[in-house]
Amino acid sequence: MAVHKYYQLSGETIKARKPICPRCGNGVFLAEHEDRMSCGRCGYTEFKK
């Protein structure tokens, strides 16, 4: 997937479209699953309520 699809431009600000992994930092996003969000790099998982 192209990098420009991960960010949203509005005026002069850039915002990430997906949540960023708190362990890995900027540039690594959490994949959204039906019941959780997980990082493919470090394995960090957040479960949805």
From Swiss-Prot:
<keyword id="KW-0689">Ribosomal protein</keyword>
<keyword id="KW-0862">Zinc</keyword>
<dbReference type="InterPro" id="IPR011332">
    <property type="entry name" value="Ribosomal_zn-bd"/>
</dbReference>
<dbReference type="GO" id="GO:0008270">
    <property type="term" value="F:zinc ion binding"/>
</dbReference>
<dbReference type="GO" id="GO:0006412">
    <property type="term" value="P:translation"/>
</dbReference>
<feature type="zinc finger region" description="C4-type">
    <location>
        <begin position="21"/>
        <end position="42"/>
    </location>
</feature>
<comment type="subunit">
    <text>Part of the 30S ribosomal subunit.</text>
</comment>
<dbReference type="GO" id="GO:0005840">
    <property type="term" value="C:ribosome"/>
</dbReference>
<dbReference type="GO" id="GO:0003735">
    <property type="term" value="F:structural constituent of ribosome"/>
</dbReference>
<feature type="binding site">
    <location>
        <position position="24"/>
    </location>
    <ligand>
        <name>Zn(2+)</name>
    </ligand>
</feature>
<protein>
    <recommendedName>
        <fullName>Small ribosomal subunit protein eS31</fullName>
    </recommendedName>
</protein>
<dbReference type="InterPro" id="IPR002906">
    <property type="entry name" value="Ribosomal_eS31"/>
</dbReference>
<comment type="similarity">
    <text>Belongs to the eukaryotic ribosomal protein eS31 family.</text>
</comment>
<keyword id="KW-0687">Ribonucleoprotein</keyword>
<dbReference type="InterPro" id="IPR022845">
    <property type="entry name" value="Ribosomal_eS31_arc"/>
</dbReference>
<dbReference type="Pfam" id="PF01599">
    <property type="entry name" value="Ribosomal_S27"/>
</dbReference>
<feature type="binding site">
    <location>
        <position position="39"/>
    </location>
    <ligand>
        <name>Zn(2+)</name>
    </ligand>
</feature>
<keyword id="KW-0479">Metal-binding</keyword>
<keyword id="KW-0863">Zinc-finger</keyword>
<feature type="binding site">
    <location>
        <position position="21"/>
    </location>
    <ligand>
        <name>Zn(2+)</name>
    </ligand>
</feature>
<dbReference type="GO" id="GO:1990904">
    <property type="term" value="C:ribonucleoprotein complex"/>
</dbReference>
<feature type="binding site">
    <location>
        <position position="42"/>
    </location>
    <ligand>
        <name>Zn(2+)</name>
    </ligand>
</feature>
